[in-house]
Amino acid sequence: MSSKKHLEVQRWINKAKSDLRVARMAFNDSVPEYSLACYLSQQCAEKSLKALLIWLDVRFLYKHQLDYLVELLPPDYQRLFEEMDIEWLSDWVTEGRYPGDYPEATRDDAQKAINMAEKIFTLANEILVL
């Protein structure tokens, strides 16, 4: 991997790691922000997948839908994400940031989102072996 590509992949992974860290902080705060934790978990997953796509030299549109990003992966990598509720996590990119007709995130939602983000982040890092 070229040093330029390595640096770009590392930048995306570092941002994903920061999003996950702050999602945990929002979840564990004395006044928890569950919607924010869900949004940041989605962001962690998105950035982890985009780092993987950059590493694989797969071009992608700057979209937030995680299922779109997973579909761009080679089939062997897609299988790693099959059991995850990727579409559910994708929804938090909007539901977690804006008021609207969405139900407020619950503690269970936030825990599920963080767990999914951790799995996606870990899988991406295991594949990348940076």
Regions found by a protein language model. Give the residues of each.
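Terminal alpha-helical segments
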Residues: 1-130
